From Swiss-Prot:
The gene is psbC. It comes from Synechococcus elongatus (strain ATCC 33912 / PCC 7942 / FACHB-805) (Anacystis nidulans R2). Binds multiple chlorophylls and provides some of the ligands for the Ca-4Mn-5O cluster of the oxygen-evolving complex. It may also provide a ligand for a Cl- that is required for oxygen evolution. PSII binds additional chlorophylls, carotenoids and specific lipids. Pfam families: PSII. The keyword Cell membrane does not apply. InterPro entries: PS_antenna-like, PS_II_antenna-like_sf, PSII_PsbC, PSII_PsbC_sf. NCBIfam families: PS_antenn_a_b (TIGR03041), psbC (TIGR01153). Its main location: membrane. This is Photosystem II CP43 reaction center protein. One of its GO terms (molecular function) is metal ion binding. It is a multi-pass membrane protein. One of its GO terms (cellular component) is photosystem II. It comes from the Bacteria.
Length: 461
């Protein structure tokens, strides 16, 4: 009987003799079989889209409208809400039907991708070159490889413009900075000034500078997507119409494993950026859906106690804390009035519930005394008890014995998962880059297949 481990398997692309890899080596067997490799990737895309659709429907089925999303372990509906679907003023979910539609559309498209993957894995041509030179994937064909880069860049650019169109023409997106506590709005005047957009890339990543993570308005976000969309599409056209220059041909390694390493390196970089963005940024990741940032929870606790004690008669402008510094208010290193106590370390935090209470010199004592709105006090109290922290001691003054059962902030979960995955992708990038460079230099022979353990194992049946 023929089995996956049987030496009698003679199907091309599936045995050691024809590929140099055992069955458990996965897609490595398909390096030189572009049709089969396409099938594997299309099927993989189908699995990803299936998870997105199924998990969206799972979250819809379990969603409780009376509770905030971040208290329900939700990580997908929060993204859809950020895009302006199903939410109203203050981030309140008013309709879950759009989420249901998105989930079903993903399930349907996953079925199409799954069928495409099965077709190309089992029935389609083993090598796409047999069908058309347009789909050629000869790893050493430098011009074709840059053509493929061009197609991908154009698709990425169109993806960036999808967000632009949604924000500008198709209902808008959720803006946590909208007056009164956030709302969905049309972004009618995106920032196109290159000095502003590319200025983010020149900023320091440290402290209050924050590189691109410091973006705090949707005009800059959408304007940035316009720029990146134009750059990606222009770059795609450039790569399709031109051939790589001599220095490019000499500088890069041109084989399948090298391209894998380049891709893993890019994904790793994007993962690290996404991790820091979701942890620190409350504009692109609104706290109404993802929960407060660590700095936000800390500042909201100081604000909550200020509101409480002021109602009890405390003079918040002059009360001293146990260290002799201001108990409720103090000065920042640059002279602004900031919250006192341990949260002083987060003095440069900005949030939509706090900014209306600032003046030209930081927090405005008159506004704190007379202008605090009920929604600001409620939101701060909610954020104070849902810090994205897992510490048993206080962090920034926040008592992190969190006032919820089994609460894990989606912000903490997403930041951690993206950081861990980015790290492993970086390791994969280094591993495959090293192998590709060694192979190109001629001294990497790989594992000796004659002594491969699987060859000494019994057949699976």
């Amino acid at each position: 009987m023929v089995t996956l481990s049987s030496p009698s398997v003679i199907a091309g692309g599936r045995d050691i003799d024809s590929t140099g890899y055992a069955w458990w080596s996965g897609n490595a067997r398909l390096i030189n079989l572009s049709g089969k490799l396409l099938g594997a990737h299309v099927a993989h895309a189908g699995l990803i889209v299936f998870w997105a659709g199924a998990m969206t429907l799972f979250e819809v089925a379990h969603f409780v409208p009376e509770k905030p999303m971040y208290e329900q372990g939700i990580i997908l509906l929060s993204h859809l809400a950020t895009l302006g679907w199903g939410v109203g003023p203050g981030g309140e979910v008013v309709d879950t039907f759009p989420y249901f539609v998105v989930g079903v559309l993903h399930l349907i498209s996953s079925a199409v991708l799954g069928l495409g993957g099965i077709y190309h894995a089992l029935r389609g041509p083993e090598s796409l070159e047999e069908y058309s030179t347009f789909f050629s994937q000869d790893w050493k064909d430098k011009n074709q490889m840059t053509n493929i880069i061009g197609y991908h860049l154009i698709l990425l650019g169109l993806g960036a413009f999808l967000l632009v169109f949604k924000a500008m023409f198709f209902g808008g997106v959720y803006d946590t900075w909208a007056p009164g506590g956030g709302d969905v709005r049309i972004i009618s005047n995106p920032t196109l000034n290159p000095a502003v957009i590319f200025g983010y890339l020149l900023k320091s990543p440290f402290g209050g500078d924050g590189w691109i993570v410091s973006v705090d308005n949707l005009e800059d976000v959408i304007g940035g997507h316009i720029w990146i969309g134009l750059i990606c599409i222009s770059g795609g056209i450039w790569h399709i119409l031109t051939k790589p220059f001599g220095w490019v041909r000499r500088a890069f390694i041109w084989n399948g494993e090298a391209y894998l390493s380049y891709s893993l390196g890019a994904l790793s970089l994007m993962g690290f950026i996404a991790s820091t963005m979701v942890w620190y940024n409350n504009t692109v990741y609104p706290s109404e859906f993802f929960g407060p940032t660590a700095a936000e929870a800390s500042q909201s606790q100081a604000f909550t106690f200020l509101v409480r004690d002021q109602r009890l008669g405390a003079n918040i402008g002059s009360a001293q804390g146990p260290t002799g510094l201001g108990k409720y208010l103090m000065r920042s290193p640059t002279g602004e009035i900031i919250f006192g106590g341990e949260t002083m370390r987060f003095w440069d935090f900005r949030g939509p519930w706090l900014e209306p209470l600032r003046g030209p010199n930081g927090l405005d004592l008159d506004k704190l005394t007379n202008d605090i709105q009920p929604w600001q006090a409620r939101r701060a109290a909610e954020y104070m008890t849902h810090a994205p922290l897992g510490s048993l001691n206080s962090v920034g003054g926040v008592a992190t014995e969190i006032n919820s059962v089994n609460f894990v902030s989606p912000r903490a979960w997403l930041a951690t998962s993206h950081f861990v995955l980015a790290f492993f992708f970086l390791v994969g990038h280094l591993w495959h880059a090293g192998r590709a460079r060694a192979a190109a230099a001629g001294f990497e022979k790989g594992i000796d297949r004659a002594t491969e353990p699987v060859l000494a194992m019994r057949d699976l049946d």
